[in-house]
């Protein structure tokens, strides 16, 4: 069994040198992917297509090869074919008759032929000859050129005949490495996953940068998204996953920055950190999942202010997409379930965000940061080969106990941001309630009575769980999540 890989039309219209270069890249990418399935896979480049051969003694690999080819960027469609030698048009008919005789019983059909090479016949003559013979010597209802029950597809290349048994639609785009590398800021949500996919499809080797706002569970979830995107669509090339611990930055923002500027300042700090990561990796562009007007930091004014934090090009492929369209695309590429279960954070952004940030005012606020804040944060960044994530995703984060009521000997810790706690204070009869914002909990917890059990509370229950997981990782087992 063979596959004929058809190049994406945008590759076909390139100049001869560019087309040849892209075709070589695609051949190499296909080989890299299929060799991981079976070392005996054969991949051969031709001028207008790429031939892939399934090992004769391993027909069971046919379906797997087809599935992998459908997810490699740069492919328009794939034809699953059987190959035959022939000399005359009658040979073609004689080869087609036993293959299609039973298939055509009581059905209308037509024959479509594509031909390359020097022959004493043309494609239409083959269609007429083969179609006439099949109509006469099978139990078909007859020939029907428009909307037939069966379309017989034949491809002729010099002295080879290919009978098409299946057409598989490809991903489109350009082969990976056709464009320069990019660094995608990934959060695990709908937007960043789709944005990352768009650049994989466009031919960029897409690396991932994750800003960890607290908790192993969130990081493992984001790693799963990145690994899925790489394994499904970009496996032909090695990429990096960079995890930057950003809790310290969030703490300083919440303690020092004016409330309305917090969201824009956080994004600017992320861009600065990502820029330094990208420069170390020799990457000249960042990718984000921002969409115009989706949240307060994504107005034109605020995006302009955010862009001023870096000299690198910031690419936003989803800038004009609506959220339902983004979710549909996430569903199509397989990241929807990951994104739907990804944590949201309580109080990480401001309660009264500005939609028209003023650059001078934002820069003045940023002067309040510790001088070496980003240096300290980036010194703790973890850079791993994405292939190693498979090991990490097999690990299970300890399940944190969640309770709906508190006993008199337990202490509730309200970890909400100060604005939330002040506007909706928590009061539980007969139970002590301490107020420790989540961004101070890691250091403050060490000073608490170790003989007591502490129940962490936030309105959504996500940050409290992540903080409990973090404390458990530090060796504290007297922690639960409080969800009244």
UniProtKB/Swiss-Prot annotation:
GO terms for molecular function: ATP binding; CCA tRNA nucleotidyltransferase activity; tRNA binding; tRNA-uracil-4 sulfurtransferase activity. Residues 63-167 form the THUMP domain. It is found in: Cytoplasm. It comes from the Bacteria. GO terms for biological process: thiamine biosynthetic process; thiamine diphosphate biosynthetic process; thiazole biosynthetic process; tRNA 4-thiouridine biosynthesis. Pathway: Cofactor biosynthesis; thiamine diphosphate biosynthesis. Residues 406-484 form the Rhodanese domain. It catalyses: [ThiI sulfur-carrier protein]-S-sulfanyl-L-cysteine + a uridine in tRNA + 2 reduced [2Fe-2S]-[ferredoxin] + ATP + H(+) = [ThiI sulfur-carrier protein]-L-cysteine + a 4-thiouridine in tRNA + 2 oxidized [2Fe-2S]-[ferredoxin] + AMP + diphosphate; [ThiS sulfur-carrier protein]-C-terminal Gly-Gly-AMP + S-sulfanyl-L-cysteinyl-[cysteine desulfurase] + AH2 = [ThiS sulfur-carrier protein]-C-terminal-Gly-aminoethanethioate + L-cysteinyl-[cysteine desulfurase] + A + AMP + 2 H(+). Disulfide bonds join 346-458. ATP binds at residues 185-186, 267, 289, 298. Keywords: ATP-binding, Cytoplasm, Disulfide bond, Nucleotide-binding, Redox-active center, RNA-binding, Thiamine biosynthesis, Transferase, tRNA-binding. The keyword Coiled coil does not apply. The active site is at residue 458. Catalyzes the ATP-dependent transfer of a sulfur to tRNA to produce 4-thiouridine in position 8 of tRNAs, which functions as a near-UV photosensor. Also catalyzes the transfer of sulfur to the sulfur carrier protein ThiS, forming ThiS-thiocarboxylate. This is a step in the synthesis of thiazole, in the thiamine biosynthesis pathway. The sulfur is donated as persulfide by IscS. Belongs to the ThiI family. This is tRNA sulfurtransferase. It comes from Shewanella amazonensis (strain ATCC BAA-1098 / SB2B). The lineage of its organism: Bacteria, Pseudomonadati, Pseudomonadota, Gammaproteobacteria, Alteromonadales. The gene is thiI.
């Amino acid at each position: 069994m063979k596959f004929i890989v058809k190049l994406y039309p945008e590759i076909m219209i390139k100049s001869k040198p560019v087309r040849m270069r892209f075709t070589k890249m695609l051949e190499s990418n296909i080989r890299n992917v299929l060799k991981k399935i079976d070392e005996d896979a054969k991949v051969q480049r031709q001028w207008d297509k790429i031939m892939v051969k399934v090992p004769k003694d391993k027909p069971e690999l046919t379906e797997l090869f087809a599935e992998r080819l459908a997810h490699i960027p740069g492919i328009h469609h794939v034809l699953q074919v059987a190959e035959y030698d022939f000399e005359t048009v009658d040979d073609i008919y004689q080869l087609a008759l036993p293959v299609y005789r039973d298939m055509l019983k009581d059905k209308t059909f037509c024959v479509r032929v594509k031909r390359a090479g020097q022959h004493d016949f043309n494609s239409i003559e083959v269609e007429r000859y083969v179609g006439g013979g099949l109509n006469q010597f099978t139990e078909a209802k007859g020939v029907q050129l428009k909307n037939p029950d069966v379309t017989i597809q034949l491809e002729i290349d010099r002295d080879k005949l290919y009978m098409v048994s299946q057409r598989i639609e490809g991903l489109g785009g350009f082969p990976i490495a056709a464009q320069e590398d990019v660094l995608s800021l990934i959060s695990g949500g709908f937007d960043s996953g789709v944005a990352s996919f768009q650049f994989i499809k466009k031919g960029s080797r897409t690396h991932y940068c994750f800003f960890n706002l607290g908790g192993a569970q969130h990081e493992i979830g984001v790693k799963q998204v990145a690994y899925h995107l790489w394994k499904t669509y970009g496996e032909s090339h090695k990429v990096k996953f960079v995890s930057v611990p950003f809790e310290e930055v969030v703490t300083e923002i919440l303690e020092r920055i004016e409330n309305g500027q917090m969201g824009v300042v956080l994004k600017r700090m992320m861009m600065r950190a990502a820029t330094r990561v990208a420069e170390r990796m020799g990457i000249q562009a960042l990718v984000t999942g921002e969409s115009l007007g989706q949240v307060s930091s994504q107005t034109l004014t605020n995006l302009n202010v955010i862009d001023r934090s870096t000299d690198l090009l910031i690419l936003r492929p989803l800038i004009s997409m609506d959220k339902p369209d983004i979710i549909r695309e996430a569903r199509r590429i397989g990241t929807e379930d990951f994104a739907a279960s990804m944590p949201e954070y309580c109080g990480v952004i401001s309660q009264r965000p500005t939609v028209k940030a003023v650059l001078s005012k934002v820069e003045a606020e940023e002067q309040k940061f510790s001088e070496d804040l980003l240096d300290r944060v980036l010194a703790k960044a973890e850079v791993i080969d994405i292939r190693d994530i498979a090991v990490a995703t097999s690990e299970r984060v300890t399940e944190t106990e969640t309770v709906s009521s508190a006993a008199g000997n337990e202490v509730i810790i309200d970890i909400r941001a100060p604005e939330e706690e002040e506007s909706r204070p928590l009061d539980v009869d007969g139970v002590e309630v301490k107020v420790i914002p989540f961004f101070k909990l890691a250091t403050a917890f060490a000073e608490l009575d170790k003989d007591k059990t502490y129940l962490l509370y936030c309105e959504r229950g996500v940050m409290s769980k992540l903080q409990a997981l973090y404390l458990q990782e530090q060796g504290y087992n007297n922690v639960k999540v409080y969800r009244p």
